[in-house]
Design a protein with these regions (language model features):
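Interfacial segments of multi-pass membrane proteins
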Residues: 16-20, 33, 37, 52-81, ...
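Alpha-helical transmembrane segments and their immediate juxtamembrane flanks
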Residues: 105-129
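Anion-binding (especially nucleotide phosphate/pyrophosphate-binding) glycine-rich loop
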Residues: 8-32
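Interhelical loop and helix-boundary elements at the membrane-water interface
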Residues: 1-10, 40-53, 80-89, 122-149
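Alpha-helical transmembrane segments of multi-pass membrane proteins
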Residues: 1, 34-38, 74-78, 115-122
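Membrane-helix boundary elements
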Residues: 28-46
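Alpha-helical transmembrane segments and immediately membrane-proximal extracytoplasmic
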Residues: 1-3, 18-27, 64, 97-110, ...
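Hydrophobic alpha-helical transmembrane segments
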Residues: 27-32, 56, 67-72, 86-90, ...
Length: 149
């Protein structure tokens, strides 16, 4: 369930920042670890989700204002293109770039890019289906023409 995925990543960031407050970028490291743990859970033979909800939770805890912006961005891109994956893609590229610039830290951007690369990889088949015209759009799902897996 997405709300749990958002919450666990946000909690990881908050706890890490609280317990290890003197360690630079510990929140980002904990957030990325949470995203990777969601994508590759050992108890599910390393076959988990695609990681965006956890990524959003991480972003929410790192910078809640940015999280609000990306929520609107994902919604807008999805409405315009009919594909959630395109909003997801724009977001996972935008967050490291924005936070790296805002915090004046290439290291922060690189830490966040670890999750970006893995999320993009996990969505690779969505991109292939969009290219071939076989990806099911959100409007089709909402109209009941297709069921999401």
């Amino acid at each position: 369930m997405a709300i749990h995925d958002i919450g666990k990543a946000a909690l990881a960031v908050i706890l890490a920042r609280t317990v290890f407050s003197q360690v630079p970028y510990i929140g980002a490291v904990a957030g990325v670890a949470s995203v990777l743990g969601h994508i590759f859970p050992f108890y599910l033979k390393f076959k988990g989700g695609k990681g965006f909800a956890s990524y959003f939770g991480m972003t929410l805890a790192l910078n809640w204002k940015l999280a609000l912006v990306i929520a609107v961005l994902v919604f807008a891109v999805t409405l315009i293109t009919d594909y959630i994956v395109l909003g997801t893609t724009l977001t996972v590229f935008s967050v490291p770039a924005y936070l790296g610039i805002a915090e004046h830290s290439m290291l922060l951007a690189l830490i966040l890019c670890i999750a970006t690369v893995v999320i993009i990889y996990k969505h690779r088949m969505n991109y292939v289906r969009i290219y071939h015209g076989t990806e099911i759009g959100l409007r089709s799902v909402m109209k009941g023409k297709h069921r999401m897996k």
